[in-house]
Amino acid sequence: MKMLSLVSLAAALTSLLALAGCLQNNGADTVTVNGDVPLAYVKRSTSITMNPTDGTSSADGGDLIIREKSSASAAEHNITAQFTQGHGDASDPEVSYDGKKIVFAMRCPASNTTATVNGQPACTGRWNIWEYDLSGLPSGTFTGGSFRRLTASTSDDDVDPAYLPNGAGFVFSSNRQTKSRLNQANGQTYFALDEYERERVLNLHTMDANGGAITQISFNQSHDRNPVVRPNGDIMFARWEHLADRNRFAIFRVKPDGTDMFVLYGAQSPGNSFLHPRDMDPNGPYAGFVVSDLMPLSRSQEGGALMFIDAANYSENNTPANNSIPAIGGQRQATAQALNADRGVSTYGRVTTPFPLWDGSNRVLLAYRPCEVTKNGVVVSCATLTADEMAALNDEGMTDAQKAASPVQDNAPAVYSIYMFDPAKQTWLIVAAPPAGFMYTDPIALQARPEPNAAQATPVDATLAAQNMALIEVRSVYDTDGLNRMAEQMLAPADLPAGCSKGIATTAPTDTTDTRPLVADLVRMKDPADAAYGCAPARFVRAIRAVAPPSNVMGMRTAIGETNFEQQQILGYAPVEPDGSFKLQVPADTPLALSIVDSQGRAFQTHTNWIQVRPGERRTCDGCHSPRRGGALNSGAIVNTMPAALKTALSAEHQAGETMAALRTRLNPSALSLGSDPVFSDIWADTSRPGVSAKATLSLRYTGNPNPADDLATPAPTNGLINYPDHIQPLWQRPRGTGGANTCTNCHTDPVKLDLRNTVSGTGRLVSYDELLIGDPVIDPVSGKPVTQIEDGVPVVVRQPALVETSSSMSNTAGQARKSRLTEILFGQTLLAGSSALASHPNPPGTAPDHSTMLNTAEKRLLAEWMDLGGQYYNNPFTAGSGVRVVNSLDQATFTAQIQPILQTTCAAGCHQAIGSDQVTSTGASFRENRLVLTGSPEGDYGSVLSMISDACHPASNLLLMKPSTVPHPAGATTQVNAVLPAGSTGYTTIANWIVRGCPAQ
């Protein structure tokens, strides 16, 4: 078969696919190409919807296929037809290290009662892990092998299996959540949905070689997918990071026991979702490189660009391991012609599921589909389109409605074929083309490869493990990466104490390979005799855990509120020592976030990814948000310098290599425990020395402060769960001033300006909440109408900044309270809200009371905590009043049969798609504007729809019906005449009748 370049491939593939019948010839007379290898892949229906967000997508017609050679004319064999019988699916094959076994995921129908395993029905209707064993077959024979079903889930889904080395078993992704469902926030037990409130979360699990001892090893709040084992024995996988505005897949690594989890690449690099990562040949010229397909979060059928990632030398595209490596160069496209890694048309096609060969050839097996669209309903090659037609497909200024009216649509089936790609020669050899209505993906070479090293187990503290606790130590929060996300740029002049020109003293790095021009001068910052000691801004670390969205409940969207954040719980506080270190015990196997807090209880940063530690694990990090590969800043001579102005009783006990936090907690183990309040007393400064002053004592308690006037007079949160109606609204109604003259609700009752009363708005929430979190529309001075703009094909209303900022940006930027204009007004400081927020919400007039003195210390702490967490309406979904309740009468089967087709027709093709984030392109529609995410996944769409229902007894009052039956919808479609889903229409009535079935009275 002729080898093609990508340019000629794009033009020739249409005719190649037309020859698919010839390519499927199973005769013995095959074309043999030097270097051919046997391979396996999956055949799947093109009716399936594949997105990174959909971890268990399925459609009838899928099977595992083995092809005898990597040649288009070689024989192929359907291995699983006896189980699927045309009504099942297969995915995610992986080959054993000796090349003689295949582990894969298969969903075969429970209606198949003829296929058995150990005398029991083999098929459960759910995704399970299977193994096909060829080891007993003659060489060159691929049929007649034996099957093992390793898992037997009847209510869970197990996918993405891979072999662990040394016969240790398997790693796989599963939504069974064996531990996390028993250990949810506030003592609850339930299956967690992802952070779109759609699908049950897929986490990494391991099991032994016989399918036993299933253990959950990852605890992300959205999917962990595509695990494989690296040559060093680590597990590498794609992690969906979806905390606040961050919404992408990065490449992570972890040991098989779940310890030492950290990002490997892609948390802050161009592009959105790095999926299907695999190591290139460790003995070839690409040793240390990882191949991945980089794609958008939706609308590309999991296809994107083929990326070669220099993971050995870069932690991000612009973060080299040392200064001898170019500053930028962590990733590059492997193909000569660039493929589109974003949404829209990709002129040269898309790639998915790459598999690099480790045979010295440096070739990559992959699935590729050409650029095809439909024109007047007929599939055509993009090469046949005019320049204007191509431009229209990629015109971001067009609305979805305008694009839907075009005869040319980017909706052709994803007909992936299997290719052998040679990156050195830039040639493509077609290996297998699917029959009509199907795709081929997930190719793997059936050849032996070196077995990875067995990763050594991490030593754990048995005492901590028995308590289901772990330990985290950060050597210095000031040891940040080149993006300076915990550096001077995060501070405002108001943060600087009197006499300080900067908050963080800096110096040139002592490490000659360091890539940073300046680093924090920790020796000065921990010296009480130096002015830098009193200028350092970090005072506390706040530990937070996720409150996962429960499955099978309604009302979650209303309960969460106008925010990009999910619900969260504050676990407690610990001090940050003068050198920037902290050391604390935290719950194990729990999704955690850590925020560094200033002296007034406001976070410097938003921690937009979840971290975890296993029971008994002692986890040490060099710094915060720092994927650098260099040595720790707080080490060597720096960490071992004990300034003379420190108390001798402490400095004399210092041991080599100890941070100040390690020293303190060794001498006082109780300091390892989180406290419920941010309180501080300087134990370090030896004030008996001339010119040495201690840092001021801090007490930010809810109650019990030295001055009772600083205590809360309103209800305090319980167990770190802050609910706006219960804890924030009472602040506005608390009597203040003489005779209550300065009570907030005395003045702020104007709906046009600011209304802080506790009346209920049209959203079902308190008016004051919506007033604080939703900015007013920007009005065109000429027309007097709201200004609109197109975002991701959707017309949206342009709004002024809200008083409370709930958009984090995906780059771990400033804390929410510090970016909120409400904070600046009530603290009397200019922080990081910005000029546009100031213009929209100017300082109160001079005739008004001094707003900076209206709230006391505890009230300001509470308000800052609520804003930093994301401004949720409720953080406890199980509290009375949240509106969240379990609903069993609105079943998924009825939804899939009756409701989903209506939504797919009227809603899913437009704005209701997952929108990703990356470092280059704009975010697109924020989640506050796009809450109902519909991808075609029955489970996911069902979960998303339930979240939009809050009152089953009154269907018309629910967002699910109220929004699309109102004109305009979306709000920016100001010229819209007819509702998307008019009240009384057949679709509307069908949905309303389904909703009312969930009413307890029905």
Regions found by a protein language model. Give the residues of each.
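Compositionally biased, intrinsically disordered low-complexity regions
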Residues: A10-L13, T905
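C-terminal motif of bacterial Sec signal peptides marking the signal peptidase cleavage site
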Residues: A18-G21
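Aromatic- and Gly/Pro-enriched helix-to-coil junctions and flexible linker segments
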Residues: T30, N34-D36, A59, G125, ...
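Bacterial N-terminal signal peptides that target proteins for export
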Residues: M1-A10
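Exposed regions on extracellular, virion, or secretory-pathway luminal proteins
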Residues: P227, V576, L584, A952, ...
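Sequence signature of WD/YWTD-type beta-propeller architectures
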Residues: L23-V553, R557-A559, N564-D579, Q585, ...
